[in-house]
């Protein structure tokens, strides 16, 4: 700010008015700063001038009426189905650890649940008669999330076989669904490490974590026609704006919609 004022020949802070601030904003954008960086600078200057005003060093705060630019919201990264299919094939389903890892992967992708929700999942939270999970979300808010055939099969195999074997190694019983090699409840960090090992086994070059699987769940649901309000409820978002970041569509989906919908996209004999 002070370098800008010197360039403009302004030495008295009381000479900074709305027009000067606008020029300063233009200068920031010419520097190709992100909206978030600009917002941060304006917010800091607003606080600084508020202090000066309180100390009677300036007559007014020229930044009070400036609306902060909305932050850039990056499009969430998601995993393509071909990459997911490779992950689904890496686990040894005859081994308790492999059964557990498969169940974690299937349930994270099937439900879009947060890693904390997966970590805290209890046996009594699973209703196999309806294939629905009762999840404790943020602020201990409950929500129900359905899951499909592949997740059901992976959970049943793990709970009936792998989990029973892991639990025998524990010093005390627990109703937590996902256990580590010693039979104790898995941590969120443990779940992330499990996914990292799966990626290594699958020889993928992408980064996979629970939140990326959550992004993938939302993206795939919306791309396949799920309405945004339903996805909002499944994800446990309070505000629709949190879900709207997933309304980007893949290039494949865009091309598919175009080819099906545009009258001159294809010839009749294709």
Model-identified regions with their sequence ranges:
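Conserved catalytic core of the tyrosine transesterase superfamily
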Residues: 1-270
């Amino acid at each position: 700010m002070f370098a800008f004022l010197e360039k403009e020949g302004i030495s008295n802070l009381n000479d900074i008015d709305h027009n000067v601030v606008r020029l300063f904003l233009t200068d920031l954008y010419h520097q190709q700063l992100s909206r978030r960086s600009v917002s941060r600078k304006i917010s800091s200057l607003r606080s600084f001038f508020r202090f000066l005003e309180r100390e009677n060093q300036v007559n007014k705060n020229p930044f009070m009426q400036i609306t902060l630019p909305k932050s850039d919201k990056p499009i969430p990264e998601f995993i393509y189905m071909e990459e997911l299919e490779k992950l689904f094939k890496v686990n040894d389903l005859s081994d308790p650890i492999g059964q557990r890892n498969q169940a974690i992967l299937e349930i994270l992708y099937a439900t879009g649940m947060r890693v904390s929700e997966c970590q805290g999942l209890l046996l009594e939270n699973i209703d196999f008669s309806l294939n629905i999970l009762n999840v404790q979300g943020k602020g201990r808010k409950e929500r129900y999330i359905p899951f499909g055939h592949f997740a059901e099969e992976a959970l049943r195999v793990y709970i009936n076989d792998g989990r029973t074997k892991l639990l025998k190694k524990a010093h005390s019983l627990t109703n937590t669904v996902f256990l580590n090699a010693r039979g104790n409840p898995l941590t969120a960090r443990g779940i992330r490490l499990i996914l990292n090992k799966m990626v290594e086994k699958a020889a993928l070059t992408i980064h996979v974590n629970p939140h990326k699987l959550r992004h993938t769940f939302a993206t795939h649901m919306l791309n396949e026609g799920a309405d945004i309000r339903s996805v909002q409820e499944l994800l446990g978002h309070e505000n629709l704006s949190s879900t709207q970041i997933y309304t980007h569509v893949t290039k494949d989906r865009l091309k598919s919609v175009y080819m099906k919908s545009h009258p001159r996209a294809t010839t009749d004999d294709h």
